[in-house]
Amino acid sequence: MASSHTPMMQQYLRIKTDYPDMLLFYRMGDFYELFFDDAKRASQLLDLTLTHRGQSADKPIPMAGVPYHAVENYLARLLKKGESVAICEQIGDPATSKGPVERQVTRIITPGTVTDEALLDARKDNILLAIHTQKQKIGIAWVDLGGGRFHLQELTEEHQLNAELVRLQPAELLCKESTPLPSFCSNFAVKFRPGWEFDASNAHKLLCEQFSVTDLSAFGEQNYPTALIAAGALLAYLKTTQKQSLPHLTTLTLEQSEDYLQLDASTQRHLELFENIHGGGEHCLLSILDKTACAMGSRLLKRWLGKPLKQHAIIQTRQQAIKEIIFLQQDVSLHQLIKQCADVERIVSRIALKSARPRDLVSLLQTLILLPAIHDELQENKTLLINEIKKEISPLPLLQQLLETAIIDNPPMLIRDGGVIAPGFDEELDELRNLSSNAHETLVKLEQEEKNRTGLSTLKLGYNSVQGFYIELSKAQAQNAPPHFHRKQTLKNVERYITPELKLFEDKVLSAQSKALAREKWLYDNLLEEIQQYIPELSDLAKSLAQLDVLVTLTERAQSLNWNCPNLVPESGIMIQAGRHPVIEPLLQERFIANDLELKPNQNMLLITGPNMGGKSTYMRQTALIVLLAHIGSFVPADEVRLGPLDRIFTRIGASDDLSSGRSTFMVEMTETAQILRQATSQSLVLIDEIGRGTSTYDGMALAYASCAFLASTIKAYTLFSTHYLELTELPKDFSCIRNVHLQASIKTGQIVFLYRVEEGCANRSYGLEVAELAGIPKEVLKLAHEHLNQIQDTQSILVQTQIIKPPTSPILTELKKIDPDRLTAKEALDLIYKLKQLECVESIN
C-alpha cells in the first residue's frame, strides 16, 4: 500500500482487500463513494459520472458516488446485472475520531442472498444454487434465503442440470474454481469459490452445526454425497456474506425425481409454462393461472407448476379441497382475507436475520389479527388438506399481544429514526422521551426568567439542529447583553448567545434524545430475538397461507374458465373429451374448437397431419398442458379427462439455431429427439412436431420414419407425432398401435379455411401453397410454384412409398427374445452361444 495515499484512502484500500470481487460502497458523509476499478465499473453499469479524487502512482484516482438516501435503487440495478456489493458504513463518531472515521462493512448483498423487500421481486423465489461434480455425479444444493428453504438433489446427466436451472432460475450460481461448466450456465451469475469450501468433511461439519446434530444420517446423506458437498459450499458462502447465524434454515429437503412428473428444459420452454416464446411473462400458463391474493401464493404456484406430482393420492387431496371450496362457496371470502395478509414467509426470514424493519412487524401483526377469521371461514371444510392447513393457521395470542404492546400502529420505516417502540412498553424509554418532549415547556420557562432578570424585551430562546439551543437578541438590545451571555452567532438583524444554564439544559436534552434512540434500538433488537422463538410456527403459518391461496386461486380458475376435475386412475392410458388449450382459449374472442384424444397401451400413438396453422401444435400442446395441470391438482379445460400413471412429458416442438453452442437448427432438433428416444418410457407422454427438417428430404423422412416406429413399437410411449411427410401415414398398416388423425381444412372461394377439428384418417394434402398465399408470397411466385407442383405430381412422387423400408427382423434378436437367462443351465448357455454364432454367419452371407 503506497504511503503517499491519504489515511482515508489507506483505510479504503485495506477494507477493499477483503472484498476483491465485490463493488465496495464506501460511506463518506451523505454519499457512498467507489474508487479505482470499482468506480469505472459502477459508472458504466449505473450511468454515473466518473470523477477523480487524489492520486495513485502519479495518476488521478477514479471516483464515482451515489447518494445514501437513494442507494436501494442503485443496488437493485446492480443485483439484476449479477453484481455483488459490500456496504461500508461509518461506525465511529466524526467529532471524536482522530484520523479517518472508523468504518467497517456492515452488509454484503449478492444476487442470491438478498432478503430486503425493496430489492426483491415479490412474486419470484430468489435462489442461490451451488453445483459440485465428482465421479459422473452432479450434486446441487439450493437455498431460498428469503423463504427459509434448503434443498438437495443428485443428478447424473447435464440435461437434468439444465432442466433444474430452467425451473429454478437461480439468481446466483456457486461453483468450485476452475470447474468447467456447460454452456447453458452462462445465462446465470456464476461465482467461482475456493476449492476448500467444496470439501466433504468441511461440509459435514457446517451442516451438523447448522442443524444442531452430530450426524447427518437422518437426512439420508449416504444417498446424496455429492449434493451434500455442494450444500456445505453453499453454507460457507452464506456465513461469509451474512455474518450471522441462519435460524430459519432448520432442515434439508431431499429432492427425488421419482416423486415428480419430469419436465426437461426443452419441455418447459416449448410449453411456455413461465414465459412465452419471446421471453415475456404474458400469455404463458403461469399468467393464466396466477390470480393469487398474496405473493407467497404466487411463488408457491410457480413451484407447483415446475414440479408436477406423480402420486395420485397427494394430487387427489388437492382436488378434494378445491371441490369442497366450490361446494361451500368459500373462494371469494377467503381470497379477500388472504389478500390482506402480509408476506409472512419473507418477514420471518428478515426476523431470523435481524433485518426486519418496524413496518414488517406491523404487517405481521395485521396478519395475526386476521387468523381467527380465516380459521372460522374454513371451519366447515373437513377435507384432509384443509384440516392440515387449519392446524397451522391457528391464532398466536402471545405473539400478537407482544407486537400490540411493543410497536406503534404506524411506525417510521427505520428503527434509526426512533419513535417505533410504543409508549408504556419500557419505563426507562418513557422517562427519556418525557425529558426530551418536555423541553419546549422548560424552554418557555427559561425564556421568561431571562426576560425578567435582564429586562430585555426582544429576548427569545430557540433551537436548530446546527446551532443547538440559543438566546436571541435584536441588534438594538444586543449592546445591553449581560456578561454571562456568550456570543454564539451573528446574523444580519440579531445576535445569538449561550449561557451556562442553557448549555447545561442543552446537554441534558440532547443526551436524553441520544439515550432514547440507543435504548429504542436495544429494545428493538431484543424484540426481534424474542420473536425468533416463534419462527417454526410462523414458517408453518406462511406455508399454509400460501397453500390455501393457491387452492383458492385454482378454485376461482376452475369456475371462471369452466374447467373440470380430471380423473386419476390406476389403469394405463390418456383420455380427453372436448379438450381446450388453457392459454389460448381465454385470449380468443370467438369460441375455441374443442377436440378429443385417446391413447392406450395397444394404440399409443397419434400420427397427426394437416396444414400449417391448422392447429396441430395447439392440439399437441393442449394435451400436455392438460396433463400437467392435472398433476398439480388443478381442474382442467376439458369436459372429461381420465389419466393413468405417467412419469415424464417430452416435447420436440419448433427449433432454432443455438448460436452460443455453435449448433444448427437441425443439430438442436436431433439432440432433443435423441434425448427423447433414450429416456422415454411406456409411461411417458411424448410430443414431436416435425422431425427431419433442415436436412435432405430423403434423410428427413428416414429419420422421421425410424423415430416414429421406435417410439410406437419399442418404447411404447404415449406419443403425438405430427408430420408433413404424408408418406408416413402408411405406418399404421405395419404398426397397429399407430392411428392417423388430421386437422381439417377446406378451400372456399380460392381461400383456405382452417376448421381446427381433429378427425380420423390422414390429410390428403398439405395446403402449403395456400398458407404461403396467406403469408403474402407474391402471386407470380405462387403461380410458378403451382406449375412446378403439378409437374412433380404428374411425373413422380418426391419419395415412393416402397423406399421406406420396414426394418428386417433379425434371427438373432428373435432367438434372444425367447430366452430367460435366469433359467439357463451352463450347458444350455454354451449351446446357445454356438447357435447364435451360426445365425450371425447366415446373416452376414445374406
From Swiss-Prot:
Keywords: ATP-binding, DNA damage, DNA repair, DNA-binding, Nucleotide-binding. GO terms for molecular function: ATP binding; ATP-dependent DNA damage sensor activity; damaged DNA binding; mismatched DNA binding. It comes from the Bacteria. One of its GO terms (cellular component) is cytosol. This protein is involved in the repair of mismatches in DNA. It is possible that it carries out the mismatch recognition step. This protein has a weak ATPase activity. NCBIfam families: mutS1, PRK05399.1. HAMAP family: MutS (MF_00096). This is DNA mismatch repair protein MutS.
